[in-house]
Structures are given as structure tokens and as C-alpha cells.
């Protein structure tokens, strides 16, 4: 995906779900808000709440399930700590365009919030669609992105909970600290 990480910038997890939940505990807490484009996978909401943060639901465009950047802009507050995106999306199957991800990245840099990029379905693209990793845009975006992936979907290994998170070293260190006390 055009991404480079050192050994200190990656951690394994008991599935991508655990990686996302651990990341939430590191980057968000009471009083914080995490943007969540909807419809979305049901577990994101509870992971945000378990971290003590508040999910802020942001509708996607109804014509193609693409990110609605105007709605995202309107939802950003000084308490916004992150946005969780899943592309290709669960449950819609929408593959967010490079253009919309670049616009989202600009917002993350401007307002200094994280992008939690769930890329578990990256290999499941059809009809000429192309997956694009938001962290590949620039170093500034890479530093604000936690890329999460795993092997269960692409390799039909759903019973094998093998996931990982990739991010800057201080975030990964925090995720590993959470994992050391929860697994």
C-alpha cells in the first residue's frame, strides 16, 4: 500500500477488532469525540464508548455511500480526537475514493485529529474499484493515521484472530501497553 514502518511502529493483535479497541483507549477518553461515518460496523460505536469517548455519527452520501466531507467538516469540534473509517466499508461495500480520502486527510492535519483506518477489506474490491491507504498521502497524514488490518477476511481465516496496527511509535507503544493488561 505504499506504507513503510519500523518494528516499533507495528503491533500484532488478537484480530483487527482488538487493535482498534486498543487504539481507541490510547487516543480517546472522557470528554473526547470520535467521528463515525454511518452506516458502520456495529462494534466501532461500543469501542469508542469503552474508551470513555463519545461517538459522533456523520452520515455518508446517500447516492454512493462515499464520505460526506461537508458533514464531516460540520461535525468537527475542538473535542474531536479521531475519525474511524473502513474502506472498503462494512456494511455498504463502498470503496472511498482517493479524492475524498485526501480531503479527509487535509481536515485531519488542519484540525489535528487521528484517522483510524480499518483496511481489513482492502483485498475485497470489485468492478474496477481500487483501495487507497490514507496513510500513504504524506508524512503529516501518516503521523495521524492508525492503519489496522488483519488476515481473517482476505484469507478466509475468520476463526484465526490475527490482526495488526501500524502507526507512529508512541501510539504503538500505548496500544501495546493496553494489550499487555487486557490479553
Please report, for each region that a protein language model flagged, where it lies by residue:
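Short beta->alpha connector loops at strand-helix junctions that form conserved
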Residues: 38, 57-61
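Conserved core segment of the aminotransferase class I/II
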Residues: 139-183
Amino acid at each position: 500500500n505504499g506504507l513503510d514502518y519500523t518494528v516499533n511502529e507495528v503491533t500484532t493483535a488478537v484480530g483487527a477488532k482488538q487493535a482498534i479497541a486498543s487504539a481507541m483507549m490510547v487516543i480517546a477518553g472522557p470528554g473526547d469525540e470520535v467521528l463515525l461515518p454511518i452506516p458502520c460496523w456495529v462494534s466501532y460505536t461500543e469501542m469508542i464508548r469503552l474508551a470513555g469517548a463519545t461517538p459522533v455519527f456523520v452520515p455518508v452520501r446517500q447516492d454512493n455511500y462515499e464520505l460526506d466531507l461537508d458533514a464531516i467538516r460540520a461535525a468537527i469540534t475542538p473535542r474531536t480526537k479521531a475519525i474511524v473509517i473502513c474502506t472498503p466499508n462494512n456494511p455498504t461495500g463502498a470503496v472511498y475514493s482517493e479524492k475524498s480520502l485526501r480531503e479527509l486527510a487535509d481536515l485531519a492535519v488542519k484540525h489535528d485529529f487521528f484517522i483510524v483506518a480499518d483496511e481489513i477489506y482492502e483485498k475485497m474490491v470489485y468492478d474496477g474499484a481500487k483501495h487507497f491507504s490514507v496513510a500513504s498521502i504524506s508524512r503529516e497524514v501518516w503521523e495521524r493515521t492508525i492503519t489496522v488490518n488483519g488476515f481473517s477476511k482476505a484469507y478466509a481465516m475468520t476463526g484465526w484472530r490475527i490482526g495488526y496496527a501500524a502507526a507512529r511509535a508512541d501510539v504503538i507503544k500505548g496500544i501495546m501497553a493496553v494489550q499487555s493488561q487486557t490479553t
